[in-house]
Amino acid sequence: MPRAKTGPGGLRGIRSVIYPVLDLDRAKDFYATAVDRNPYFDQPFYVGFDIDGQELGLDPDTSERKPGPGGAVAYWRVDDVAETCRRLSEIGGRVVSAPKEVGGGLTMAI
């Protein structure tokens, strides 16, 4: 897959959108039907669907975000998380959570 052009802030496009859900099994069944595929990751703490290179995630932890689309969180795809955080901070962005490894070779920051 060709790499997308990186913008001046290091952002390449949305990588993931994660919805907090109250009923993980019901949401999993709904989205499996809606996107016509099974999740690639299916655990009690998270369900993930790969939809042509973008992730739809379902998170049963609603302690910090309200369930449904209003509580959804989008994550950007970048080449270098630490460098992108630095560059976005320089132009007025705020890093809420420093870059950290979250498993599977993935690093994230908020």
Name each model feature, range by range:
Residues 1-10, 14-22, 47-50, 65-110:
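Vicinal oxygen chelate
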Residues 12, 18-56:
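Core segments of cupin and vicinal oxygen chelate
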Residues 35-40, 75, 98-100:
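Short linear motifs in intrinsically disordered
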Residues 41-42, 59-63, 101:
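Acetyl-CoA-dependent GNAT
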Residues 55, 64-65:
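Short, surface-exposed beta-strand-loop junctions and turns on beta-sheet-rich folds
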Residues 56-59, 110:
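Conserved beta-strand in the GNAT
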